[in-house]
Curated annotation (Swiss-Prot):
Superkingdom classification of source: Eukaryota
Gene of this entry: rpt-4
Keyword ATP-binding: yes
List of residues binding ATP: G191, P192, P193, G194, T195, G196, K197, T198
InterPro entries: 26S_Proteasome_ATPase, AAA+_ATPase, AAA_lid_3, ATPase_AAA_core, ATPase_AAA_CS, NA-bd_OB-fold, P-loop_NTPase, Prot_ATP_ID_OB_2nd
Pfam families: AAA, AAA_lid_3, Prot_ATP_ID_OB_C
Protein family per UniProt: Belongs to the AAA ATPase family.
Any one Gene Ontology BP term: proteasome-mediated ubiquitin-dependent protein catabolic process
Matches recorded under Gene3D superfamilies: 1.10.8.60, Nucleic acid-binding proteins, P-loop containing nucleotide triphosphate hydrolases
Keywords assigned by UniProt, alphabetized: ATP-binding, Cytoplasm, Nucleotide-binding, Nucleus, Proteasome
Any GO CC annotation of this UniProt entry: proteasome regulatory particle, base subcomplex
GO molecular function: ATP binding; ATP hydrolysis activity; identical protein binding; proteasome-activating activity
Protein name from the UniProt record: Probable 26S proteasome regulatory subunit 10B
PROSITE patterns linked: AAA
Amino acid sequence: MLLLQFSNMVEPTGPAIVEDERTKALNSYRRKLAECRDIEQKLKDLRKKESEMTKQFDKSENDIKSLQSVGQIVGEVLKQLSEEKFIVKATNGPRYVVGCRRSINKEELKQGTRVSLDMTTLTIMRQLPREVDPLVYKMSHEDPGNISYSDVGGLAEQIRELREVVELPLINPELFKRVGITPPKGCLLFGPPGTGKTLLARAVASQLDCNFLKVVSSAIVDKYIGESARMIREMFNYARDHQPCIVFMDEIDAIGGRRFSEGTSADREIQRTLMELLNQLDGFDSLGKVKVIMATNRPDTLDPALLRPGRLDRKIEIGLPNEQSRLEILKIHSNKITKHGEIDFEAVVKLSDGFSAADLRNVCTEAGMFAIRAEREFVIDEDFMKAVRKVGDAKRLETKLDYKPV
């Protein structure tokens, strides 16, 4: 009994002590490793904060310098005399022979380039972008929207022809070089109102990663002589500077009408605008990445000089849709409508003879209005039948237009 108690009082030796020390060391290592990771994360956050504060400090310093610095004069380069000297015309009138900063690329300082001049030495400090008219700047910020070709129903042949004229030369110009032909400069979309001319142009611009200028032709006409022609020049200069670019001119009959000898001063101003447009169309580079799309519902009033090949190489007629096309368009417009039960679209299409795409969209809107009138949150087949009859009765008051090939 005494021997047993003595053995219990003896401390463990050998492997047990080694295992205990190993466990303690391992736990200590894990704690140190966790502390190291925390310190690394804190260091990373501090460095990120330091970088942000450095950027903010630099920005504040630049703002203070810009507030303390003297303004500069805007001028225009007239001629390069030597490698370092240029003749510059200031905005207030006089001309100066000035030097240039070393950091500026002198090859880009061509005639007509806008530059900023130092107030005291008149040295060229930096190159400025081309002056853009506010109206042209507004045109360039026109968003074509996220429209795909599947949103344009019943125009498969017209889409193919338009993509050959606009999309193919921008994506694969080498194909035209190998064949040995000059790519078309632009095309004319003509047809009755509401057939999808503007929608088709927006779909092309949305699918291409390029700049888009939407021009309403009636907005170009100005009461002051020469202003309309200047707007055309600035518009095409902006398009050339921001290639690839698509210029879409809607309602081109506002400035592209047939010229005649008699008329008022306003008519002569519109004719001068048309002549400037003809000049800009002829001035394009053969493989330039600027394409023109024009749209009108009055092709018979356009000037023959505008329609000749070399300016508008392809004329695409967008007529009223046939029965199959009307079915496709109706399904596209009714896709987002909350429907209940089965809708007989074929019966609706048979009652919509002579309808345009805009009329079919109006049918869907009227069907929704009938559902709202009946205090329902969904549209049934009867609503579509009522809507197509209502739109058909309204179309009888419209005058039918005859579109002959251009």
